[in-house]
Amino acid sequence: MKGQSTARLEWTPSATLPKARTSFAGVGYDEMLERARRLVPKIAARAEECERLRRLPDETERDLHEAGLFRIAQPARVGGADLDVGIFVDVCAEIARVCPSTAWNIGNLASHHWMLGYFPPETQDELWDVSTDVLIATSLAFPAGRGRKVEGGYEVSGRWPLSSGVDNSDWNMLGFMLREHEDGPPVDHRFALLHRSQYEIIDNWHAVGLCGTGSKDVATKAMEIGRASCRERV
């Protein structure tokens, strides 16, 4: 995909994302924790399915969207609950009692709305204008990715491990080492925000007890992306 346009990407949300926009602004700590507790029986009933599928079941993903658990740290300006980091610990502890993989995905994917808030406004809009419920995976193994500056942005390539929740996600934040020249030493770290059409998911995750995290590798060949699709480490 070398030479691909760095213009704003038009994308279609996954079928599992809610069609209607819902605001969770004003939902407080206690209410969000109670929402997690009410989901425990359903998640417990699907725990074996989650491990068998090696990803979140669609029904579980929909339940988590409806409850707002993926949006606990999303900025309030786009309808997120905008709660502090303590809610991650308590919500995930409740869910982990019955399905550690689901708990892992909640904490992991919910934190990426917070991370997206550090990208330029036009990049936030590229995702949240289409769906405020968008799911974003990550792999923060910076040495796994390589990048260099090109006109208008960066050229990025690599193979990244442990991209939890990648099958349920439409986007991915992938770490890379920035080099001034192809064979030069790293000079900085960056995140690249890529749509799932821009990388390959490699089906190699079979960890006993945490198969449902779906922490597969992802890879892309030389890919040019716009400057607004990259940022320094949060």
Predicted regions and their residues:
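A short glycine-rich beta-alpha junction/loop motif
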Residues: L64, G212-E224
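Glycine-rich flavin
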Residues: D58-E66, R71-S169
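Intrinsic disorder at enzyme termini
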Residues: K2-G28
